[in-house]
Amino acid sequence: MKKKKVKPVKQMGSTGTKLQKEVAAMEEAMKQHHIEEQCQLLIDEMMPQIKRLGRSLSGTYHRNIIEYTTSRIKSPESIVEKLHRKNREVSLDKAVATLRDLAGIRVICSFQDDVYRVAGAIKNLPGYELVKEKNYINKPKASGYRSIHLILRPANTAYDINYIEIQVRSAAMNYWAILEYQLCYKNEKKGAE
């Protein structure tokens, strides 16, 4: 089944006003419930563990295994668009209950073999439960996108946000993912003009 593309809020015609209101409401609800702060705390707790894991693997294999890491918190606009894409009610409660990628970390490795080493080590981190794994290396998306996505849940959390997504890919895979995103965004922008 082909995913329906949702145009970014700024590009929508008459429905833009409704979506803009939904985004504003989501932004306000996220502020009231300190969602960004909770996501950042999850990221801040996970990041040192990934860096330690990288140092350990680099020592074992006598070379740099993890090139770099980045993190992000899903924006209110992206949350609203994803809820629409999944035909879900647009509310903070629904987002927190159903979206497992509000907080995310991307781990860029040197080589494909390293991706599997790092993903395997992340799955076994103490204090986290692996909830879901998507292997887009074995089964790439139609666009050619390749990566491993891990959804983890901290064993002990006092937050409303109970999941963090870790994407692990090689530098070459990351280059393709960035290029694909830019091409897709450029085509959507052209279609809206």
Give the label of every model feature segment.
Residues L102-I108:
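Terminal, regulation- and interaction-focused segments at domain boundaries
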Residues K2-L57, D160-E193:
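An acidic, glycine-/histidine-flanked metal-binding catalytic module
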Residues Q32-I35, C39, I43, P76, ...:
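Generic alpha-helical secondary structure
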